[in-house]
Curated annotation (Swiss-Prot):
It catalyses: (2S)-2-hydroxy-3-oxobutyl phosphate + 5-amino-6-(D-ribitylamino)uracil = 6,7-dimethyl-8-(1-D-ribityl)lumazine + phosphate + 2 H2O + H(+). Keywords: Riboflavin biosynthesis, Transferase. The keyword Kinase does not apply. HAMAP family: Lumazine_synth (MF_00178). Pathway: Cofactor biosynthesis; riboflavin biosynthesis; riboflavin from 2-hydroxy-3-oxobutyl phosphate and 5-amino-6-(D-ribitylamino)uracil: step 1/2. The active site is at residue 88. This is 6,7-dimethyl-8-ribityllumazine synthase. Catalyzes the formation of 6,7-dimethyl-8-ribityllumazine by condensation of 5-amino-6-(D-ribitylamino)uracil with 3,4-dihydroxy-2-butanone 4-phosphate. This is the penultimate step in the biosynthesis of riboflavin. It comes from the Bacteria. Belongs to the DMRL synthase family. The lineage of its organism: Bacteria, Bacillati, Bacillota, Clostridia, Eubacteriales. 5-amino-6-(D-ribitylamino)uracil binds at residues 22, 56-58, 80-82, 113. The gene is ribH.
Amino acid sequence: MKIYEGKLTAEGLKVGIIVSRFNEFITSKLLAGSIDCLKRHGAKEDNIEVCWVPGAFEIPVIAKKMASKGKYDAVICLGAVIRGATPHFDYVSSEVSKGVAHVSLDKEVPVIFGVLTTDTIEQAIERAGTKAGNKGYDAAMSAIEMSNLMKVLD
């Protein structure tokens, strides 16, 4: 039996990161977590490129653009969608997750879903670097592992 796994080294990896400007007080912490993870695992700062978009809904189209270029080993998508009093949360959360998954499958590039979908601001803050860890860091770990696994399987 053969078992395949991706290494947890970012040396030589080129990573694109897309960050939603909406809820920037949260997303900037997710971005910092992603960059910290990539650098701790050997990525060079010159191999990390960041695109800011207005909101989470705009993430998939830029993910598609970045994944289509063929220069990124992975694309990390970061955002924070927080439930409000209207159904807007449900529409945005659903479409962003579908869009990100579609791009990854279509382009065969790891496109990592690091978009927080929380009921409260407090939950988002917890997931952006306090008691629930930093989901931006976690998304970068997934990007590293998946990028290396894709290389093993090529």
